């Protein structure tokens, strides 16, 4: 035990291992959810939302509910704008903390028992947190752009002679695909916020990073997973 503690304290092994497990858990979870959604769309809340958005687009375009479309897209755009602004403000806060790294080394690593005080890792932790926030910002900004494109596309009416049903279905599918892309980018931005929580706990020590990663992934699974009764209902409908 003494030998193991000396090995850990004399290197960055514990920090590197916990960060590797953090990346593996988050990226593995996202791949797992994506794989399950492709095989069974009603397995996750995201899959059900994609189906609902496609149905909503078809209904709006067929019945000409332009006001409803504008109001709904405006709400989605405002939410994405607020979160994008939040990501930028948090990034500015991280940049401010980078100039006070000496104080953070003393106040944030209070429990030395769970990991050695590697002061050289503090800038790297801040950079990783900053990259995570910028990624979330770009995803939210991309979703805003896509929501704006959908606003133009969903109100466009084909006025040519070819008014066949197949032409209308194709148009609805194109708009629904664009709207689902906006929803996916919004979801990835939220994933960036969720993955930020373990990174903040990393400042207290690598064990806190690992524990927070397990907790956040567990919570995300319960939030993303469709309940059995709801899954059976959507399968029947």
Task: Give the role of each language-model region.
Residues 69-95, 183-210:
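Transmembrane alpha-helical segments and their cytosolic interface motifs
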Residues 162, 221-233:
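Juxtamembrane membrane-interface segments at transmembrane alpha-helix termini
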Residues 33-73:
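Membrane-interface amphipathic/juxtamembrane segments adjacent to transmembrane helices
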Residues 9-20, 113-129, 206-211:
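Hydrophobic alpha-helical transmembrane segments
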Residues 2-6, 88-115, 202-210, 216-221:
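Juxtamembrane "helix exit" motif at the C-terminal ends of alpha-helical transmembrane segments
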Residues 15-43, 81-96, 126-149:
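Hydrophobic alpha-helical membrane-embedded segments
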Residues 31, 35-40, 149, 153, ...:
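Membrane-spanning helices that line or support transport/gating and their immediate boundary helices
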Residues 56-67, 152-183:
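Solvent-exposed, non-transmembrane helices and loops of integral membrane proteins
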């Amino acid at each position: 035990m003494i030998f193991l503690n000396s090995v850990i304290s004399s290197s960055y092994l514990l920090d590197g291992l916990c960060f590797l497990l953090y990346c593996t858990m988050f990226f593995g979870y996202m791949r797992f959810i994506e794989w399950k959604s492709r095989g069974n769309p009603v397995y996750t809340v995201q899959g059900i939302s994609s189906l609902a958005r496609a149905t909503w687009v078809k209904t709006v375009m067929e019945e000409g509910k332009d006001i409803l479309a504008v109001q709904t897209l405006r709400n989605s755009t405002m939410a994405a704008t607020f979160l994008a602004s939040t990501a930028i403000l948090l990034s500015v806060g991280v940049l401010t903390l980078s100039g006070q790294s000496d104080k953070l080394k003393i106040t944030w690593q209070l429990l030395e028992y769970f990991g050695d005080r590697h002061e050289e890792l503090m800038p790297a932790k801040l950079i990783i947190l900053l990259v995570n926030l910028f990624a979330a910002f770009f995803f939210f900004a991309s979703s805003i752009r896509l929501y704006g494109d959908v606003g133009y596309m969903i109100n466009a009416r084909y006025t040519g002679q070819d008014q066949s049903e197949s032409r209308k279905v194709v148009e609805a599918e194109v708009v629904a695909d664009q709207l689902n892309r906006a929803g996916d980018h919004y979801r990835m931005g939220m994933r960036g916020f969720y993955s930020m929580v373990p990174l903040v706990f990393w400042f207290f020590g690598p064990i806190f990073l690992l524990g927070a990663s397990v907790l956040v992934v567990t919570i995300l699974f319960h939030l993303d997973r469709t309940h059995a009764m709801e899954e059976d209902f959507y399968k029947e409908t």
